[in-house]
Amino acid sequence: MTIAKIQKYLEEVALLNNASSLAHWDMETMMPSGAIESRAELLSYLEGKVHHLLTSKKYSSLLESAKKSKLNTLEKKLLKELLWDHQLTSALPAKHVEELSHARTMTTHIWAKARKNNDWDMYYPHLQKLIDLKKRESTYFKSKTPYDAHIRQFDKNFTAADISKIFSELKKGLTKLAKEVNADGRFVKIKDLKAPFAVEPQVELSKYITGIFGLEADKSRLDISTHPFSTTIAPNDFRITTRYNEKDLDSFGSTMHEVGHALYEAGLPRDKWNGTPFGEALSLSVHESQSRFWENIVGRSQEFSSFIHPKMKELFPTQMKGVTPEKLFLMMNKSVPNLIRVESCELYYNLHVIIRFEIEEMIFNQGLDAFDIPYMWNELYEKYLGVRPKTHAEGAMQDSHWAGAAFGYFPTYTLGNLISGSLYQKMKKEIKTFNQDIERGEFSRILTYLRENIHSKGRAIEVSDIIGGEIRTKDYLDYLKEKFDV
């Protein structure tokens, strides 16, 4: 009965979080810019209210009562996750939560304007305020380093030292692979499709992808935002965004990525566990594994290139003239270093993440100020990728994450890639028609596997249950070697 009481108590928290999600989505897609101050106040209030409910004496009493109750194995796991969340939330003063929320909302708004105008001077004082707030936040937690306090908010199983070790190993493997791919030349010399690409057929392609991957139209929306994102407003209300540019087809990849996130959210067992950890994603690393899986392992595969080829010819007849499925596959996986993370190929993508990880570590553990981030950013891009940004918009202002105070999030992209690589190796053995299904455009078997083994489990499982062991680099590197045929 105690667990049932906890679930009942958390219903109000879930509703408040729904309201926050809707307000965030509206802010990024529809809200008039003049409303930003009132929106910041609203979000600060809602997040403060949630914090109050989760740190109240009543809720603490319910958790204490559950600890003394006779629970089955599943309930014990749920309680463990509830206690972990309570520990994190209780460590933060209410005033800090509200102040951070307000600053985060305002900074995100300013970031969008500053990015458009390539104006770091407009942006960095607000970013520095967020950094100072997050540095203060790290003092509320017991962690080995200040940066660890932020990493564990997105994936509790890792520290900066753990990630650094994994990234070091991955860097070596990627460097070796890049040399082999460059020597082979096929994925380097291939020319891009010729622009321009009208927005209307891009929108049609995005909607087509959303449908064939399995996201239900009556429970989802596709809109436009400065930076693509996915959010869940409530059970059966999943919102994704992308962005369109007539100079390229990057909306193709970003839509597949965000659909992957939304499919995970749509498969969570909210009918039974809404508002509890079991109704939530296992971690942000696992969340990113799902988006990267659909974007890359499915969406950039040779089989998918064959499947999508007729649709591409229909929507972009001039650009696709003379382009075979094999050529399209090479184009979709063109492997040259670039400046923009979300536009990067798989071979170099993780280096973009590693750069951000190293800068975040410098910010929190070594005292790097916001003013100096562009210099360090440009130096690391030249060191790791051999390219140097000419503008802040294509440099340190390209992502919205830091403006949203999501320090510690970036490593989850690469951890997600590694999980997706292991998942691919496992699924190929268990779904004998894996490649054929993709080539035929039949994704139901793949989605069902993900629903049964990951989505429907929420936080009731561990990563090892998904991939048969710890997160490792080998499976992902093997997947890339297979794809690039080197």
Regions picked out by a protein language model, each given a short descriptive name:
Residues 1-158, 459-463, 471-486:
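A well-structured
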Residues 6, 142, 257, 291, ...:
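Divalent metal-coordination and catalytic microenvironments
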Residues 21, 34, 38, 52-55, ...:
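C-terminal, non-catalytic "cap/extension" segments appended to globular domains
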Residues 38, 99, 126, 166, ...:
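Secondary-structure capping and boundary motifs in well-ordered enzyme cores
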Residues 103-250, 459, 469-470, 476-480, ...:
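Contiguous, non-catalytic segments that form substrate-binding/exosite surfaces or channel walls
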Residues 142, 246-268, 288-292:
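Active-site recognition of the HExxH zinc-binding catalytic motif
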Residues 167, 171-174, 199-203, 209, ...:
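All-alpha helical catalytic cores of prenyl diphosphate-utilizing isoprenoid enzymes
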Residues 279-321:
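Post-HExxH zinc-binding segment in Zn-dependent metallohydrolases
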